[in-house]
Every structure is written in structure tokens, then in C-alpha cells.
Amino acid sequence: MLIKGINHICFSVSNLETSIAFYEKVLEGELLVKGRKLAYFRICGTWVALNEETDIPRKEIHQSYTHIAFSIEKEDFERLLQRLKENDVHILQGRKRDVRDCKSIYFTDPDGHKFECHTGTLEERLQYYKEAKPHMTFY
């Protein structure tokens, strides 16, 4: 296969300083470099780039379920929720989910990019779907 993995994730942000604070405090990102209009972080081993773009439309982003999901341990769920609240992060109402589907917290960065912190794994999700969703086809 030619594709080896995800190289980096890039977000357009409206205010670089505000976003740097969010990615450091909330996501515990390691700031690697900062320029006039860009910043690079390492988050969970992944390169995350922020590019400041002040003149693009941002309203459409709120209508999509598109998001980046991070894995968290079940025992860290409440601690993360508390950190989000302490940093005045916009926490989204999550979808209704079966207890077998584990737990998630959905929230946004200052520009409305959606994030999820999820306690489950892909294997757990597939097993739950096999048990509860007979209309699905598995390969």
C-alpha cells in the first residue's frame, strides 16, 4: 500500500493565540513551533498544524458531525470533563448511546472544530454492532 498512515492534521483557526492556548491547556499538546500565522503541535504522537485564516466562512462547520476522536481511559473520563469545564470549553450534547458503546465527550475548539474523547475501541464498537444491529453487514 502506498499510504503509510496519517501524516498530519491541519485546522484553519481565526485567532492563533487563542487556539494555541486551547490546544496546550485542553488537549495537552506539545507546542513545537510558532510563526506569525501557524503553529505545530504534537498531540498523542500526531502532528497537528494550526494555520490562522481570518477571512474564511466558519458557520457551516457547526452543521456537520465531522470530528476528530481521541482515545481516553474510562477512569479518566470525569477528570477530562472537569478540565473542559474549568477551561470554559464548549461541550456539545452527545448522541444517545447504549452502555455497550462506551462513553464519549464531544466539544469544540474556539473555531468550532469538533472533538470527541471516547473510552471505547474499534473492536468494542464492532462487537456491540454485531450484537445489536442486525441490519449491518460486516466484512
Curated annotation (Swiss-Prot):
CC cofactor: Mg(2+)
A family per Pfam: Glyoxalase
SUPFAM superfamilies reported in the protein's UniProt record: Glyoxalase/Bleomycin resistance protein/Dihydroxybiphenyl dioxygenase
EC primary class: transferase
Keyword Transferase included in the entry's annotation: yes
GO cellular component, one term: cytoplasm
Localization per Swiss-Prot or TrEMBL: Cytoplasm
InterPro entries registered for this protein in UniProt: Fosfomycin_Res_Enzymes, Glyas_Bleomycin-R_OHBP_Dase, Glyas_Fos-R_dOase_dom, Metallothiol_Trafse_FosB, VOC
Annotated coiled-coil segments of the chain: none
Amino acids binding Mg(2+): 8, 67, 116
VOC domain boundaries: 5-120
UniProtKB keywords: Antibiotic resistance, Cytoplasm, Magnesium, Metal-binding, Transferase
GO MF entry, a single one: transferase activity, transferring alkyl or aryl (other than methyl) groups
Family: Belongs to the fosfomycin resistance protein family. FosB subfamily.
NCBIfam families: Fos_BSH (NF000493), PRK04101.1 (NF003152)
Subunit structure of this chain's protein: Homodimer.
Function: Metallothiol transferase which confers resistance to fosfomycin by catalyzing the addition of a thiol cofactor to fosfomycin. L-cysteine is probably the physiological thiol donor.
Name of this protein: Metallothiol transferase FosB
Gene behind the chain: fosB
